[in-house]
Amino acid sequence: MAKNKGTRILITLECTECRTNINKRSAGVSRYLTQKNRRNNPQRMELKKYCPHCNKPTIHKEIK
């Protein structure tokens, strides 16, 4: 008997300002790995998290 997929899935959050900003502290793009509940949050997730490359809290969006 096969188990069903859980409601929680792993997602990657990526900084939106790192892709467009050229005046960064260091090269690279900030990414966080987290979980989300598929039933409670069916749309793409956006969180304000600290970006070490931009050296400030920025919006991080879910990527595929």
UniProtKB/Swiss-Prot annotation:
One Pfam family, short name please?
Ribosomal_L33
Query: Where found, per UniProt?
Result: Plastid, Chloroplast
This protein's GO CC annotations: chloroplast; ribonucleoprotein complex; ribosome
Q: SUPFAM superfamilies, alphabetically?
A: Zn-binding ribosomal proteins
Give the highest taxon in the source lineage.
Eukaryota
Assign the protein's first listed, main location to one coarse class: plastid
InterPro entries, per this entry? Ribosomal_bL33 (IPR001705), Ribosomal_bL33_CS (IPR018264), Ribosomal_bL33_sf (IPR038584), Ribosomal_zn-bd (IPR011332)
The chain's coiled-coil residues are none
NCBIfam families per record: PRK00504.1, PRK00595.1, rpmG_bact
List, alphabetically, the HAMAP family matched: Ribosomal_bL33
Per its record, how is this protein called by name? Large ribosomal subunit protein bL33c
- What is the organism of origin for this protein? Thalassiosira pseudonana (Marine diatom)
Query: Which gene name does the record give?
Result: rpl33
